[in-house]
Amino acid sequence: MAIQHPDIQPAVNHSVQVAIAGAGPVGLMMANYLGQMGIDVLVVEKLDKLIDYPRAIGIDDEALRTMQSVGLVDNVLPHTTPWHAMRFLTPKGRCFADIQPMTDEFGWPRRNAFIQPQVDAVMLEGVSRFPNVRCLFSRELEAFSQQDDEVTLHLKTAEGLREIVKAQWLVACDGGASFVRRTLNVPFEGKTAPNQWIVVDIANDPLSTPHIYLCCDPVRPYVSAALPHAVRRFEFMVMPGETEEQLREPQNMRKLLSKVLPNPDNVELIRQRVYTHNARLAQRFRIDRVLLAGDAAHIMPVWQGQGYNSGMRDAFNLAWKLALVIQGKARDALLDTYQQERRDHAKAMIDLSVTAGNVLAPPKRWQGTLRDGVSWLLNYLPPVKRYFLEMRFKPMPQYYGGALVREGEAKHSPVGKMFIQPKVTLENGDVTLLDNAIGANFAVIGWGCNPLWGMSDEQIQQWRALSTRFIQVVPEVQIHTAQDNHDGVLRVGDTQGRLRSWFAQHNASLVVMRPDRFVAATAIPQTLGKTLNKLASVMTLTRPDADVSVEKVA
């Protein structure tokens, strides 16, 4: 219910297609993606500027692929440290688990350290590319209300002036204490950890050793992390009876740092801050014309670095669907698949993060003894040890329902999983990552075949209205065979041989890839038409009003 101010006339009225509450990483990613799709966006943020202190320190391959989708990855990479290993240590300093996955199936290193404020600044600068995106800081969201075809937001500026925003949709990216979620009375189920952790960031890294170390000390567990630009992060468990004020006192801070540094007096402190680790999940992600994303929808402990990355997955999943609905290319039932696809995986990442925290700081002493024993035993079980150290236990996003069409058993199907991103060779000889050849679009990718062959003229018209790219993959040595060219089809060479292996493994020759790079369906040329009809129905696509021209893609 909106708060009414009958005696105060609003200073400004805004009318937009999408209002985003919160200029954190998820809100800024949503704004960048929608901006490049031509959607009119307004971001409103309570603070007067971006948060400038480090928070998240881990960005994964999926999040970098999301940055790539909005043309910002080259600006983000200088603020990352790729291939960032995570090492678990016993109290005596023995490494019992060294997690350093070395695969790059999605085009980027799987584990990377990063400096969040600098990456957030890249995204804020990124929205300036789009005249249809505006960001308003120092705007407190006082109230909002939903009507059949719009959401009305009531804002207050730092000077006390009122503004009204009329939007078709509201995306709440306003954090774990989300005003939007609380106003809608959406349950935020889960637990708050009984213990807290104090985070200490130091400039001119006094250790300068690479990677991140988690020391499972039963007296006081701690974390030591090397970050880009010579920043060192330490995290110490706050013990019962201690307060943030006490730990901030110089003598107590010196005592903490003496645990990890030979000279705790010779440091350049950036900041200290106490955190409570929560594990909570919103019961619903969509409430009519309001959608929850990022921490507003789920929060999790930091131990797997997945809070930030889960928020990026939300933005990538939601943004393309919202754009299609606003453009009239799909009905709003498509937005129901956002919760259907994202909520279960967010829960899996919460559970994994809680488990990792329990490995670092077991709730009971005997659990620590068991952990140490199991870690020793793993040395005699190399396949099991590799399973953990290569992070194969990480729940890869897989959707079992939603905007996809699956034939056969789900367990072995690639449908609902992210498609690989190898390097490909273009016809002009350039070598690039696959997504760069596709852009922010759907793609129908065929191994060796003309992907248009199994489609009717009506289907070609429908999918071209979505800016779908049609890709023919051939062995690299065939890339200049002119007679195989087809109008409206982009030919690429399989530079690394990974696409051939993928299609051979999954017994398919055609894949329909969504804009968020997930496999929506697989087929062979003779079944593609039927599959596309099913997918169009599942996604509630509308029919294009006019013919879409077919042009030759060089």
UniProtKB/Swiss-Prot annotation:
GO molecular function list: 3-(3-hydroxyphenyl)propionate hydroxylase activity; FAD binding
Keywords in alphabetical order: Aromatic hydrocarbons catabolism, FAD, Flavoprotein, NAD, Oxidoreductase
Entry cofactors: FAD
EC number per UniProt: 1.14.13.127
A UniProt-annotated Pfam family: FAD_binding_3
Gene Ontology biological-process annotations: 3-(3-hydroxy)phenylpropionate catabolic process; 3-phenylpropionate catabolic process
UniProt keyword annotation of Protease present: no
Residue numbers binding FAD: 17-46, 285-295
Annotated pathway: Aromatic compound metabolism; 3-phenylpropanoate degradation
Keyword field contains Oxidoreductase: yes
InterPro entries listed in its UniProt record: 3-HPP/3HCI_hydroxylase, FAD-bd, FAD/NAD-bd_sf, PheA/TfdB_FAD_monoxygenase
Catalytic activity: 3-(3-hydroxyphenyl)propanoate + NADH + O2 + H(+) = 3-(2,3-dihydroxyphenyl)propanoate + NAD(+) + H2O; (2E)-3-(3-hydroxyphenyl)prop-2-enoate + NADH + O2 + H(+) = (2E)-3-(2,3-dihydroxyphenyl)prop-2-enoate + NAD(+) + H2O
Its biological purpose: Catalyzes the insertion of one atom of molecular oxygen into position 2 of the phenyl ring of 3-(3-hydroxyphenyl)propionate (3-HPP) and hydroxycinnamic acid (3HCI).
Family named by the database record: Belongs to the PheA/TfdB FAD monooxygenase family.
Name under which the protein is recorded: 3-(3-hydroxy-phenyl)propionate/3-hydroxycinnamic acid hydroxylase
Species per Swiss-Prot/TrEMBL record: Escherichia coli O157:H7
